[in-house]
């Protein structure tokens, strides 16, 4: 187990957005969060790196590697908990600098050789190196949308996170680019724990080891993806998977 939440409740002012969420996130597995828009998926995801701190009141416990995230320095926390957003958000810097910036900031690189090796390694992990090896000094904004999103994943990997959060990482991409990202995530999960929000149920079925269904801020059902999709236990889950609402 890499992380867990215990009796997690979240409030935006007087409105409660999450209700008593209890969940365990397994090590080196992909956990998908599904549910209709506004059900609390992204809100839940952002509890792990404290991105809700300034806008919400949070009760309950969120732990990563047995440590309460509330008691951790937020910069140190976000080094260990990477995040990839819905829209690619590359830095307005070179492809090379997009990878090297954060490791240098955190003092993880001792010399130029280490820096270059890290950049190459991260780009290779996301299958991007061969596509960009001759243009590492070019602005990352020149890349296609799919390439930019893979660069964002490589950038997140550069600081060696324990947990990677992905908020609909393929929703802004074409089907081919989405497929590339899905295969990449499955490969990365051999050595990395991930939580992924997705509106695409079939994507969750293809990619995730575990799936959680949220409805109106409540965790309705959670389990191994094969069993979850083939034999859902809760009536609301069955209705959602059948397309009765969403």
UniProtKB/Swiss-Prot annotation:
Residues reported in the UniProt entry to bind ATP: 35-42
Query: What catalytic reaction does the record list?
Result: phosphate(out) + ATP + H2O = ADP + 2 phosphate(in) + H(+)
Keywords from the named record: ATP-binding, Cell inner membrane, Cell membrane, Membrane, Nucleotide-binding, Phosphate transport, Translocase, Transport
TM annotation in the entry: none
How is this protein situated with respect to the membrane? Peripheral membrane protein
What EC number(s) is this enzyme filed under? 7.3.2.1
The record's listing under Pfam families reads: ABC_tran
State the source organism's domain of life. Answer: Bacteria
**Cited SUPFAM superfamilies:** P-loop containing nucleoside triphosphate hydrolases (SSF52540)
Q: Which PROSITE patterns does the UniProt entry name for this protein?
A: ABC_TRANSPORTER_1, ABC_TRANSPORTER_2, PSTB
Explain the purpose of this protein: Part of the ABC transporter complex PstSACB involved in phosphate import. Responsible for energy coupling to the transport system.
Family named by the database record: Belongs to the ABC transporter superfamily. Phosphate importer (TC 3.A.1.7) family.
Instruction: Report what the protein is called.
Output: Phosphate import ATP-binding protein PstB
What organism is this sequence from? Campylobacter jejuni subsp. jejuni serotype O:2 (strain ATCC 700819 / NCTC 11168)
The organism's taxonomic lineage, starting at the top: Bacteria, Pseudomonadati, Campylobacterota, Epsilonproteobacteria, Campylobacterales
